[in-house]
Amino acid sequence: MKRKVPSNINEQRIIERQGKLLQNYIKKVVYPFSPFYKSLMDVQGIKTKMIRSVQDLQHLPLSSKKDLLITPENPLKTREFIIQPDAQVLKRRPQTVIHALLKGKKAAQKNLEDEYRPVFMTSTTGRSSEPIPFLYTQTDIQNLSVAGANIIQLGGAKKEDKILNMFPYAPHLAYWLAHYACMSMNLFCLSTGGGKVMGTEGNIRMLTKIKPNIVVGMPTFVYHVLKQAVEEGSACSSIKTLVLGGEKVVDGTRRKLSALAEKLGSPHVKVIATYGFTEAKMAWAEAPATPGEPSSGYHLDPNLGIVEIIDPKTEEVLGPETPGEIVFTPLNARGSVVMRYRTGDYISEGLTYSKCPYSNSMVPRLVGKISRTSEFKSMQLKKLKGTIVNFNEMDHILDDLEGIGTWQVELKKVNNDPLELDELVLHLVKDGRTSRELIEHRIYESFQEILEVSPNAIYFHEVGEMRKRQKVGDVLKEEKFLDNRPTSVENTLKSQSNNPKHQTEEIK
């Protein structure tokens, strides 16, 4: 059953309840059964009685992806984060004894196995390191179902609605959240497995045959499917909502997808972005909004986890509605568990407890733009003076510019020489009647104004060529940012004057 939070609950009551859940979780699950956190708390002298509230959570050190990475000295590092209960301790607990007396020893044993035995796994994508596995027990699958049901209910889905799941079939959070969400809500769902399983044509075929009311998937892949469907003259007038995950969703993406859906015969489509990560074993969604309306922010479930916002430099916990890095702590997880996990994601307007303007919900929300702190790259605009380039903003610039369909940013070295300067190259597909010259002018103008750097070259491609460049249907996440630089020396970015003779070329 879905655990409900009253819509009129206030910030104080939410925090008080989370404190009680946290205290119980640390005392009964994390400290006794997590090898990593038991050792950490013992070494640092952190007693379970010291953690009784959300504020007390700060006694625990922050964790990050580097804590999970295997090393030659410790090739089984990730196992230290798996909850590993002591059977004798569990058998002596009052709730276990009562369960055995009321329903028998076998039922009590099954209950404990459902709670603690890992039966399922997802993993990180492994773009910056080796994939990191995260294990789930039946308890975690129930949590995943609840988180998915929250998204479906927030999106206003009805029992008769049909869902087309275009997420790639893989041990990837987004695919399985969509699957378990539909199962828990008893909704019809066809999962295509994305491009690798059925290809773009297969997804278009299912789109026109099933006539889904809700389409879920990666923004880039959904764009390619809808774009090709329009080009082929296909029709689908049933789509009400697009639910997107796995990639950043900027305003320009929303407008493009909404326009494509309208060309297919589905006007006034709502676009919902979700935010989640493997380490949380769940995701959260915005309230539905028409493209052009401001985002409501991501609605959190305060019964399943605590979100803190910290200063990424000082690690100080910040107050509500203050920008900072997102830190997550589960409140009911089993299997793989990471406490106070630094996501590396920066939220521009922080955490709010105010009423959602669309859903009227009072649950906590993450508000504003989310960007990866790792996408602030140090590069050399000149040989002696470096500049921080915010690659997060490139999504907004390129998706918001009129006339650009899809795109790819490529970083490379001049002449492929590791000792040379960096080059920033844009690959574009022109969409609509806007001229190439005007698109180029707008790009250079926007890049200089916002990023203080200009692309070294702009190449225009046909749609099919861009699909190959982005590896649509071949990889888990389409490649919108491609770093082809050797990594043996520090990267530098080739200097551009304010009025360069920029290189452009059309590739057929």
Question: Where do the language-model regions lie?
Answer:
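Nucleotide 5′-phosphate-binding alpha/beta core
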Residues: 1-123, 129-146, 154, 422-427, ...
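Active-site phosphate/ATP/adenylate-binding loop shared across adenylate-forming ligases
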Residues: 4-7, 64-272, 280, 284-290, ...
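Hydrophobic, Leu/Ile/Phe/Ala-enriched alpha-helical segments that form helix-helix packing faces
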Residues: 29, 152, 229, 257-261, ...
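Detector for glycine-centered tight turns/loop "hinges" at secondary-structure junctions
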Residues: 129, 233, 314-316, 476
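AMP-binding/adenylate-forming catalytic core of the ANL superfamily
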Residues: 215, 327, 331-451, 476
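Conserved AMP-binding/adenylate-forming
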Residues: 249-354
